[in-house]
Amino acid sequence: FCTVIILILCIMKSTRCILSIILGLLAGWLPLGAVTVLKNLQVEYQTNPLGIDVSQPRFNWQMESDRYGACGQAYRLWVADSPEQLAAGRYIYDSGKVLSGESVGVVYQGKALQPSTRYYWKVSVWDESGTEITSTEPAWFETGLLGSGWSGARWIGSSETQLSKYRSHYVIDYDVRVAEGNDKAAFVFGARDADNYVSAELDLNGSGDARFILRHTTDGKTTQDASESLASIIPASDKHKAHHIRLKVTTAQYALKYFVDIEIDGKTLVNSSLTPEEKERKSRGDFWGGKEGAFTVYPYPDGELVYHCRLYAIGFLQPKGQTATFSNLCISEDTWNTLLYNPAETYVEKGEGKLNVWYPGENVSAPMLRKAIKIEKPVKSARLYATARGVYEFSVNGQKVGKDYLNPGWTDYRYRIMYNTYDITDLLRPGDNGIGAMLGAGWWSEHSGFLTGWQDQYGTRQSLLGKIVIEYADGTRETIVTNDSWKCYDRGPITFNGLQNGEEYDARKEVNGWDAPGFDDSSWKPATLFAAPPVNVEIQGYVGSPIQNNVTLTAQSMVEPIPGVYVYDMGQNMVGVPRLTFKGKAGQEITIRFGEMNYPETIPTEPVAPYTIAMYKEKKGQVYTDNYRSALSTDRYILRGDAAGETYEPRFTFHGFRYVEIHGLERPLPLEAVKGIVLESIGVRTSGYETSDERVNRLFSNIIWGQRGNFLSVPTDCPQRDERMGWTGDAQVFARTATYNMNVDPFYTRWLYSVRDNQGDDGSYANYIPVVGFPPHGAEDGGGAMGWMEAGVIVPWQMYQQYGDVRILEQHYASMVAYMDYLERRAVRYVQPFGGFGDWLAIEPTNSMLTNTAYSAYDALIMEQVAKRLGKDADQRRFRTFYENVKRSFNDLFVNEEGRTFAPTVESIFGKDSQVGMWPGTAATEAKIVDTQTSYVVPLQFDLFNEKNKPLAIRHLVENIKKHNYTLTTGFIGTPYLNLVLSDNGYDDVAYKLFEQTAYPSWLYPVLQ
């Protein structure tokens, strides 16, 4: 994603100017005749939006003319509460003629808008000749609830919690009694099949001390992990009594290891083999794995890339001739204290030496909720206001409501939940109507981020909040809300769903007509009521671009690498879900896997460990998924056996992929039966780029597809693996390009709410937003990496520059000032501390004190301009002074006499006891020359070199580029500015050579792979 950031659009200054520039260039050959129109009328940067939840919305329009130099000199804006009133001149707001050429962000100044009301508007513009042009296209906006409340609506859901077999943190409790004359009782968890599982065995050991033995079996080979005496817990006289076993299981990063804490009869089992150092480490825990359990089970210690330390199947493995009784079995989680599985059975296991396992909780599916309503009068309009803790999909009379996916999207639900507004007028019918909703895990529960401990980030059980307002033709209104009069069913077809791990769907469990009128729901249970969020959580009208499908791909080719396995190439790396159409027998299971590339047809002769030639031969042509790490990214579908065929499109997940691998078919699907439903949150495309060089065109296409894939509710770093997080560094370096490519003002406005919500008390911004971490509180440290935290300053500034969005500066200003306070407090001699990510993934690492300090200067430059735009004169002077001081210190401390970049020691700036940060590289223990591309590019872009040093820095930069044969050595923060700096300083020729380079590392290198 980040390696394709280029600045080929740098000639553009602002989206407000692009249209007039183009028309000016075309004026020489356009036909004569003054034709000027007003078009693209928008409210809050959206066309005819529903559910606007702001009291003073903003209006935009574009003036289009075939005459050179046409421009607006004045405008007049009218708003009415019906088309008839607008035509008759009876307005609720008339701006009067305003002598201004502004056409972006014009603020409504009329009387208070009413909630749940549609308003119509038009605008007139007077051009430079005084001619009045009035808009003709229909334009309206509709308010949301505007704080009017939810009319008693309650959060509803299921009384049961869906238990995933892919769960990585859980607690297993059970009672066990070994029959007289017997010695052993073995419980099993983590069973993927008969050759892969973990066993926890109580061994009464005849006349000896009872023992507890932990083993794992991998590919049929059994290894003992622990054997501990129970002499202090189970005396000889109690051996054959019932004993309570508790296994608290967690996993290491990427689910590579099981960590197990064991209690027997309420007493903790101590691992006697641990060294003092291991005990200390396990008690302390760390960022990557949290607190390790006392015992470790490592199924693949040789480092094979598998991520299978999960719950999977549970059961028993009784040795031959050994009988034991298991009872009071339950599985829970101890973060939100949720009981996940609690069967009533007592299991008497008579030893046959065979594995007896099952998937716990597989009968609980995604909740389905319904309500029957009756319409007895003609309907004028009907609106649905809805949100969920989780994700949801509404339907009315069997038809899906809206075009969105995975609503309400991702915000930090600890602070903010957004609701959606839908027009359901045309879905209602006279008489009986059926209202339905399904709930999925979404970002609320299941796995988040790149650590398997980051599970159930906000809770374990999903819930729905809804309100339907029906306005009848006679002027009366009826309101229907979610409450315990709704019915719930949790034995439906979606047997599992998670954004990272995929969806599992059993079509045999479909309930025909469940969301239609006349359905008999007498066997359904009343919906369970859930507590409302804490009072600090704001429930806000939806802001931003919803996740939708605007592009659909069809498979381009298919191969069969091994019999019965079919791999389809979509022709383009994409983000979304498949839509597959197939026929088969009832109960036939189809497994769908995804990959961005396949194992090569040509077998490497010297593979890099842990890969082997045998592995490459075995997997030749199949999808490669190791780069997904612990994200299983697998869908499963069980056919219902419909002779007419069945179509499957997952509802509550998404994948990043180019290749679709399908198992379980009797014959391959035709290409037209394999579709790729591209999901994205991007706005309207506002730019294009085409050259005579197909490599460059492909690069630009990659950039657009990269934006499509990573702009999904939040700006992510990657959409395919076990991360998918709103990394702020990725967001800020791409923000300028993103604002050129698409109308992303609503998208970024939405994300900046979370940026502010997650800001630290000290003013720092988080490294990824929404903040995720070990629940219930998320990441404790939040942030601290400069170049990442700068998203809180750079993104709103780019929005203002490209869209004229003053309001985002007003909304975000206090937050930005708090960040500047933070930078000033922690600086010493105007130098920022070493640490953070620095120039992440650079070929040549750059000292992070240098880049951190440079970014603090850039923050001050931006804030000087923001303060000026908002009329805050004292702040403007403050930030200018801060910038000048940083610049002076930078030249004194980071540049030597030859104009080369230089790294002083941390101690020389911060003292002996200073705490240095993390990678890349280490803090300088002795002063040394830096002399990397980034060390010149970043301060040059931020105008930090003084008059003496600037020409020297430019020369050294060019020398470095030539030394590396016109290839990139920059990383995240150096790459975006490199060509700009070269062009701005008279080196277009070097910039072109760098840009046209195809050797590694370069912009065009990945295009040719």
Please provide the spans of the model-predicted regions:
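Bacterial N-terminal signal peptides
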Residues: 20-29
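Short, intrinsically disordered, charge-balanced linker/junction segments flanking boundaries
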Residues: 30, 155, 247, 1006-1009
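Extracellular/oxidizing-compartment recognition motifs
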Residues: 36-118, 122-176, 180-246, 250, ...
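Active-site core of glycosidic bond-cleaving carbohydrate-active enzymes
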Residues: 400-401, 424, 429, 441-443, ...
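Boundary at the C-terminal end of the N-terminal hydrophobic targeting segment
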Residues: 32-34
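Short, Lys/Arg-enriched N-terminal segments with co-localized hydrophobic residues
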Residues: 1-11
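Bacterial N-terminal signal peptides that target proteins for export
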Residues: 10-19
